Amino acid sequence: MALWLQTAGQLYLPPSKPVARVLSTDEYVQPTNLVFHTGTDRMLIVGHPYFDIIDSGSNNITVPKCSGNQFRVMRLLFPDPNKFAMIDRAVFNPERERLVWRLEGLEIGRGGPLGIGTSGHPLFNKYGDTENPAAYPLKQNNGDDNRMDVSMDPKQMQLFIVGCKPATGEHWDIAKPCDPAPAKGSCPPIKLTQSIIQDGEMCDTGFGNANFITLQEDKSGVPLDITNEICKYPDLLKMTKDIYGDAVFFFGKREQIYSRHYFVRGGIDGDSLPDSGYYLAPQTDKPQNNLGGYSYFPTPSGSVASSDNQLFNRPYWLHRAQGANNGICWGNQLFITIVDNTRNTNLSISVYKQDAAIDNRYKYKQEDFRQYLRHTEEYEVELILRLCKVPLNPDVLAHLNVMDKNILEDWQLSFVPPPPQGIEDAYRYIMSQATMCPTDVPNTEREDPYKQYTFWTIDLQERFSNELSQFSLGKRYLYQYGLLNGRKRSASSFVTKKSKTVKRKRTK
């Protein structure tokens, strides 16, 4: 009797212990009735929209770059609730519990009018117009410089990401080639790179999320504001799939783009066009005999900016986060990543450079004026935070230790080392030259894990208040849950009396 057997291979053995399940914060975090409001001041930024202005003598930045296409990454620092002087032991038992902040709601305020800001390049690689050509382009001769002064408006983008860890971005960059290395002038291999989004980095403006420092060596393929920059795009696929959900509690995103013009690049096309199957050979005496370029590209445009589709200047209430972390601000901090180029107006400032004042007899000369560009931004953030308790039982501590051991270190919880075995040496004059060098004392302060990154750090440790009715966002929070004591018009009371009818007595 013939039997069919499966192809022999490696035997799969399941793990001896069940895989640990990631707990949601709602399973072990206990909310309290203490709710606080905090917020920032009106935060203003002024700078040049395209690049940093550097002093040639001292090599210091005199005017920083400030563009509406930059990421604003705010790192909000909260006070440690475990250091509060709370007398009521029914609310918090420091021997068995620890306090954390939970995000209930926030509002990201943006000031200023809506506006479109343009960017461009005085030497932009644009050989010809391929949208509505009137004649076939001439042959590119060696040594020609066909770069033009071109400007455009960027892709329209509104974005905010809220989490207790910084957001992750992605961009395309040059990869290390395999052996043998490609010839000089060949297209390099590229790879997708993930990195933390920092404050001041550029977002995608319509030319892709790429490292234009390495991918465009001619320095003329993109506008000035991203020529020497890395344009990043938030890696939402990775952050929303994170098992702990610390980087994204929730996010809002709106993009809008269309193609305004169609151009072709100047230069030699590196990838040869196949001879057969794509076109028929032209006549030898026609301009088409010298095949034109085919490295086509569009110029982006964000089109109309309207207040009807704004993501900012409105409250957001967090009821259920996307991941396992339902708004718990581990480390007493919150990261808010923002992009908004709908308020992207660049102020044009003209300054008369001559010593004499301008009077009625002056005749205009353009060389008498210097032109400057400045971009301004205005932000304000309001938060509603609830105080919550975390029980210090073994299951919760084991889960937190696997998730982030820094949480236990911040709570001053650690394993007790065993007592020393035997007697140890202790020198009296250990700092003198007669003895050996003292051992290095370890640093007791925990090192900041984000010290190598650039964030807009905002200290809110002294800006908390439990008087929610005194703040705009606090009033809306109380009104949402029916806790706001509003004045009601008293109802008028009317007393109705029934009149009794008197019956006449019938007489005989």
Swiss-Prot record:
Keywords: Capsid protein, Disulfide bond, Host nucleus, Host-virus interaction, Late protein, T=7 icosahedral capsid protein, Viral attachment to host cell, Viral penetration into host cytoplasm, Virion, Virus endocytosis by host, Virus entry into host cell. Transmembrane segments: none annotated. GO terms for molecular function: structural molecule activity. Coiled coil: none annotated. It comes from the Viruses. GO terms for biological process: endocytosis involved in viral entry into host cell; virion attachment to host cell. GO terms for cellular component: host cell nucleus; T=7 icosahedral viral capsid. Its main location: virion. It holds the Pfam family Late_protein_L1. It is found in: Virion; Host nucleus. SUPFAM superfamilies: Group I dsDNA viruses. Self-assembles into homopentamers. The capsid has an icosahedral symmetry and consists of 72 capsomers, with each capsomer being a pentamer of L1. Interacts with the minor capsid protein L2; this interaction is necessary for viral genome encapsidation. Interacts with protein E2; this interaction enhances E2-dependent replication and transcription activation. Forms an icosahedral capsid with a T=7 symmetry and a 50 nm diameter. The capsid is composed of 72 pentamers linked to each other by disulfide bonds and associated with L2 proteins. Binds to heparan sulfate proteoglycans on cell surface of basal layer keratinocytes to provide initial virion attachment. This binding mediates a conformational change in the virus capsid that facilitates efficient infection. The virion enters the host cell via endocytosis. During virus trafficking, L1 protein dissociates from the viral DNA and the genomic DNA is released to the host nucleus. Belongs to the papillomaviridae L1 protein family. This is Major capsid protein L1. It comes from Human papillomavirus type 60. The gene is L1.
